[in-house]
């Protein structure tokens, strides 16, 4: 929990407040023991279990004139998400494709470009396919995501219950209306990039089975 706090504090976004108007300084003003106790109480102490506070929706301008929706969880909920990420990430990393570079530790766009260039030279192939999944974060199927998490070997029912609550946290829109989501994972949530990679993991391995293991491609590689 304290490691999660330090990781969040290192990010300047931790000073951005959620719907409860609090930021990282409100956590930092408490003793380490009190922070640990508070997190444990939020997660397991209430009668109905963990209930994240409404996520603040903010529209971020894009260069093309459109906007990108950003979901800003309250700071204590961000701390809980960071704890979950630290638990799940090592398990998931062991199951992810080596050719996946998005939102992963010690991997970047530059690594992906270098890998692509190397493969083009080795295979004597000269085509790269680029595509975008429209509205990906807003359309993640919750039930399928939970099944995918389970298939990766994460079977702790309390943890899965908390993830379900995170996915269905109320969203406070810019016009002050509240939306109860039944799909998607908000861009801006600490755990959202990891959940996105879990959703796309099956696609990564399917692509590998279609092309990476293609005998013709292997022959050309030689």
Describe the predicted segments one by one.
Residues 1-33:
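Non-catalytic, polymerase-adjacent accessory regions of viral genome-replication enzymes
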Residues 1-13, 86-99:
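Charged boundary/loop elements
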Residues 19, 86, 131-133:
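Residues immediately flanking
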């Amino acid at each position: 929990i304290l490691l999660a706090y330090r990781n969040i504090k290192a990010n300047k976004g931790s000073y951005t407040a959620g719907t409860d108007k609090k930021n990282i300084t409100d956590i930092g003003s408490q003793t380490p023991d009190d922070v640990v106790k508070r997190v444990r109480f939020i997660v397991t102490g209430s009668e109905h279990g963990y209930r994240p506070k409404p996520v603040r929706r903010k529209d971020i301008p894009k260069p093309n004139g459109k906007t990108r929706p950003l979901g800003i969880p309250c700071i204590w909920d961000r701390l809980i998400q960071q704890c979950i990420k630290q638990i799940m990430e090592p398990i998931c990393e062991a199951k992810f494709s080596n050719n996946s570079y998005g939102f992963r530790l010690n991997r970047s766009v530059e690594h992906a470009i270098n890998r692509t260039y190397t493969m083009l030279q080795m295979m004597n192939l000269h085509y790269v396919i680029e595509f975008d999944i429209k509205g990906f974060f807003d359309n993640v199927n919750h039930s399928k995501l939970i099944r995918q998490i389970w298939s990766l070997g994460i079977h702790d029912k309390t943890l899965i219950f908390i993830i379900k609550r995170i996915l269905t946290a109320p969203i406070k829109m810019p016009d002050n209306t509240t939306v109860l989501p039944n799909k998607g994972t908000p861009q801006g949530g600490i755990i959202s990039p990891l959940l996105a990679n879990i959703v796309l993991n099956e696609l990564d391995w399917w692509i590998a089975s279609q092309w990476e293991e293609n005998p013709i491609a292997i022959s050309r590689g030689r």
